[in-house]
Amino acid sequence: MTNIRKTHPLLKIINSSFVDLPAPSSLSSWWNFGSLLAACLAVQILTGLFLAMHYTSDTATAFDSVAHICRDVNYGWTLRYLHANGASMFFICLYLHVGRGLYYGSYTYSETWNVGILLLFAVMATAFMGYVLPWGQMSFWGATVITNLLSAIPYIGTDLVQWIWGGFSVDKATLTRFFAFHFLLPFIVSALVMVHLLFLHETGSNNPTGIPSDPDMIPFHPYYTIKDILGFLIMLTALSALVLFSPDLLGDPDNYTPANPLNTPPHIKPEWYFLFAYAILRSIPNKLGGVLALVMSILILAIVPMLHISKQRSMMFRPLSQCLFWLLVAVLLTLTWIGGQPVEYPYVIIGQVASVLYFLIFLVFMPLVSAMENYLLKW
């Protein structure tokens, strides 16, 4: 008798995606982050759903409703901190996942890569709107500053900002629509994840060597399911430790002060996972230039496949490119640090140097070094 998982219309889709899927035998732990991201998304949707049952998206009650969740709802504090710190875990996994794609040349699967960039933008938008919902000082001023950036768009900028706000400032209408979109977007992200997987399974997985692995494939289950479960356990242990021991480690103390339009915090800054982009934005003295640099800091990933001129796909056997990659990581960490510092000497100049380096590595150094490696290998 044929196994039901191979004949049932629904089960055979799951079977071909997670059970009998042929996978390269050499995948390292860097390939765990896809499944970890799926786990993060599931945790975020579940905790978010339960939080939404108690949250009110009204400027008069939003802050108090979050306090009520933490104080009066059974395990409300756990839900709230799982959701807040789950977002941090989500972005850690996201950035490592993208870094893996850059290092091992996975971006040559252009459809999968482009859907991945769309996913990155969607998750960033979701996280930004979620940060506004507790209606603390940093929520309000973060929303004001970031939405105001759209006013740099010529001709339609000011109208666009007022249209997004639903008035002449960030107020009740803004909070209500941000809650609506924050609730909706994770489901759109889930749909995009399906498309991401669909494109991935069209080509099959890349592997650390970057060479075709057709002659050496193994079934996804049990080999990689067990590996993924270990990844889940490690991530959930880290998340639980963060939630139970220092839930406010990655948050901003200013967000425990209710939003006050008459009092600006001394340093307005976003959550830590946006600081690198915020530093790039601040390093350009022109408003429109800053906004373009901010968008390009992520969108530059879309042109990475076009700039790939190396004869080898992965960086595994390209030591010069490896040095550049780790320089890029160092630059990103520097930008993250600068984004959290006040706008004064020497932070401004460090941020500007790091921003220029960030774009130079992608646009100039990577192609140059690839060409040099090709020449050294006489290709």
From Swiss-Prot:
Heme 1 (or BL or b562) is low-potential and absorbs at about 562 nm, and heme 2 (or BH or b566) is high-potential and absorbs at about 566 nm. Keywords: Electron transport, Heme, Iron, Membrane, Metal-binding, Mitochondrion, Mitochondrion inner membrane, Respiratory chain, Transmembrane, Transmembrane helix, Transport, Ubiquinone. Component of the ubiquinol-cytochrome c reductase complex (complex III or cytochrome b-c1 complex) that is part of the mitochondrial respiratory chain. The b-c1 complex mediates electron transfer from ubiquinol to cytochrome c. Contributes to the generation of a proton gradient across the mitochondrial membrane that is then used for ATP synthesis. It comes from Brachyphylla nana pumila. Heme b b562 binds at H83, H182. GO terms for cellular component: mitochondrial inner membrane; respiratory chain complex III. GO terms for biological process: mitochondrial electron transport, ubiquinol to cytochrome c. It is a multi-pass membrane protein. The cytochrome bc1 complex contains 11 subunits: 3 respiratory subunits (MT-CYB, CYC1 and UQCRFS1), 2 core proteins (UQCRC1 and UQCRC2) and 6 low-molecular weight proteins (UQCRH/QCR6, UQCRB/QCR7, UQCRQ/QCR8, UQCR10/QCR9, UQCR11/QCR10 and a cleavage product of UQCRFS1). This cytochrome bc1 complex then forms a dimer. The lineage of its organism: Eukaryota, Metazoa, Chordata, Craniata, Vertebrata. The chain crosses the membrane at residues 33-53, 77-98, 113-133, 178-198, 226-246, 288-308, 320-340, 347-367. A ubiquinone binds at H201. Heme b b566 binds at H97, H196. GO terms for molecular function: metal ion binding; ubiquinol-cytochrome-c reductase activity. Its cofactor is heme b. Pfam families: Cytochrom_B_C, Cytochrome_B. This is Cytochrome b. Binds 2 heme b groups non-covalently. CDD domains: cytochrome_b_C, Cytochrome_b_N. It is found in: Mitochondrion inner membrane.
